[in-house]
Swiss-Prot record:
It comes from Dehalococcoides mccartyi (strain CBDB1). It comes from the Bacteria. Its EC number is 2.7.4.9. The keyword Transferase applies. Phosphorylation of dTMP to form dTDP in both de novo and salvage pathways of dTTP synthesis. GO terms for biological process: dTDP biosynthetic process; dTTP biosynthetic process; dUDP biosynthetic process. Gene3D superfamilies: P-loop containing nucleotide triphosphate hydrolases (3.40.50.300). The keyword Nucleotide-binding applies. This is Thymidylate kinase. CDD domains: TMPK. It catalyses: dTMP + ATP = dTDP + ADP. SUPFAM superfamilies: P-loop containing nucleoside triphosphate hydrolases.
Amino acid sequence: MSLFITFEGGEGCGKSTQSKALYRYLKKLGLGCVLTHEPGGSKSGDKITRLLKWSKEEHISPLTELLLFNASRSILIDNVIKPALQDGKIVICDRYTDSTLAYQGYGRGLDLDTVKCVNSLASGGLVPDLTIWLDMDDKAALLRKGELPPDRFESENNGFHQRVRNGFGAIYATEPDRFLKLDASLPQSEIFSRIKQRVTILLGCRNE
């Protein structure tokens, strides 16, 4: 029984924490499960990630970001996500195409149809069964990052992060049935309880 679950949200919203918790929970249930992330998730993809997040030697335009993110995505899908789904496993991915649309489309201002087209080409049209959106005020979320040095995206101004948040909201509005929207400022235990509830329902439907 294959299932594709993605986590989305702005910087510092707790995606990584919750995706790891869900992975551990499903493994304890004895279910075949793969945890991965974007950008990266593969050796080649991780090299692209370092360029995207930390390069200071050259200017990286929004269009270049779009193409690099999707190059990394294509590698990840071909080598990790599709094989796992074909093997009947549950795949949990920290970020996916919605992030690219929110960041490079709404955040950077690239044409939304162009972003959607490139995303679709790179993903082969693969759409998540469930997308968990952890929504949080961008200023509060960035405070969670602590004293770690910020990458290129974390370093952007508040206006950028607000546009990204608005972008996720716009995506959610067009496909509400695919999403589980959660307030990321809630206690982590409460957030995870709601995630477990939704995933359990989804697993039950798939087993019928």
